[in-house]
Swiss-Prot record:
Consequence of gene disruption: A double secD and secF deletion grows very poorly on solid medium at 45 degrees Celsius, confers a severe cold-sensitive growth phenotype (30 degrees Celsius), as well as having defects in Sec-dependent protein translocation. Has no effects on Sec-independent Tat substrate protein export.
Family statement: Belongs to the SecD/SecF family. SecF subfamily.
Segments on the Extracellular side according to the record's topology features: 40-129, 174-176, 249-251
InterPro entries, alphabetized: SecD/SecF_arch_bac, SecD/SecF_CS, SecD/SecF_export, SecD_SecF_C, SecF_arc
Subunit structure, as described in the record: Part of the protein translocation apparatus. Forms complexes with SecD.
Keywords: Cell membrane, Membrane, Protein transport, Translocation, Transmembrane, Transmembrane helix, Transport
GO cellular component, one term: plasma membrane
Transmembrane stretches, start-end: 19-39, 130-150, 153-173, 177-197, 226-248, 252-274
NCBIfam families: PRK08578.1-3, SecF_Halo
Protein name: Protein-export membrane protein SecF
Species classification: Archaea, Methanobacteriati, Methanobacteriota, Stenosarchaea group, Halobacteria
Length: 287
């Protein structure tokens, strides 16, 4: 049986500025990507059919992708091949055509329509407001709870800043990798709030509330926290691969966003959060 051990990091070799520079630089780049995307497209991240409205067809055919696109009067928004069962998932934006018209065009071309899902533009807009509102409320509630737990500004802001970065970085990567904002990716962002707070509170509790010096407490927290996060990343990678092979776009998107966020969480927790806690323990408390 293979044994996994988390290597200890000698934090004494690095200054607070050196440790904080990398996560803050990555956060700044992520914010620039999101800001640039907003200027270019009018939205910080591309919304999917769940929020803009549209129609999604799953068709079975041996035809090439170009022939699938040519079978419809309206230009498809996207065409994804599902190799596992020989189907295509064809997506149309709202207003392109009715679901009945698209189904008729697909059948006239000799394609077998396995399933068809349609979302109206009005319903999609309302769903987007509810989903993003829920994300904002969840983040605000998490922030209030963290401040109530620690009742000290620096440890609390360390957790909140790490959680904020854990959400912003995946959103920027969603833009770069062409992943649209959907109900699935919003759910993944909500899960990231929980993952982030979990590892950050674990670190804060070991450093602030348990015996031992700062570096011993940090090492103990890392043994548990890093193992937990790497296990989650491995599970999400497997889920993403399997979901992609079988054409389950929702699970593939959730898994990809979670891998982005959990990887960012390792950096933010054990570089940025550790930096703020070390400053608080050795400099902030004495002031």
């Amino acid at each position: 049986m293979v044994e996994f051990t988390v290597p200890e990091v000698d934090y004494t070799r690095y200054t607070n500025r050196q440790l904080a520079a990398v996560p803050l630089a990555v956060l700044a780049v992520a914010l620039l990507v999101i800001g640039g995307w907003y200027v270019a497209t009018g939205a910080p991240v591309n919304p999917g059919v769940d929020f803009t409205g549209g129609t999604e067809l799953r068709i079975a055919t041996d035809a090439p992708q170009s022939e699938v696109a040519a079978a419809f009067d309206s230009q498809p928004e996207s065409i994804r091949s599902v190799a596992a069962d020989g189907t295509y998932v064809v997506t149309f934006q709202s207003g392109s055509a009715t679901s009945t018209e698209l189904q008729t065009q697909a059948e006239d071309a000799g394609f077998e329509v396995r399933s068809i899902d349609a979302v109206s533009a009005n319903f999609g807009g309302e769903t987007q407001l509810l989903a993003l509102g829920g994300l904002a409320v969840a983040f605000a509630g998490m922030s209030v709870l963290v401040f109530a737990m620690f009742r000290s500004f620096v440890p609390s802001i360390a957790v909140v800043l790490s959680a904020f970065s854990d959400i912003v970085i995946p959103v920027a990567l969603m833009n770069l990798f062409g992943i649209e904002l959907s109900l699935g990716t919003v759910a993944a962002l909500l899960m990231l709030i929980g993952y982030s707070v979990d590892s950050d509170i674990l670190l804060n509790n070991h450093v602030l509330r348990r015996s031992g010096d700062f570096y011993e407490s940090t090492a103990r927290a890392m043994r548990t926290g890093v193992t937990m996060t790497l296990t989650s990343i491995a599970a999400m990678i497997v889920m993403t691969i399997m979901a992609t092979l079988f054409g389950i776009q929702l699970l593939a998107a959730i898994g990809t966003v979670l891998v982005f966020g959990l990887t960012a969480d390792l950096m933010n927790t054990y570089m940025l959060n550790v930096t703020l806690l070390r400053w608080y323990k050795f400099e902030g408390v004495t002031r």
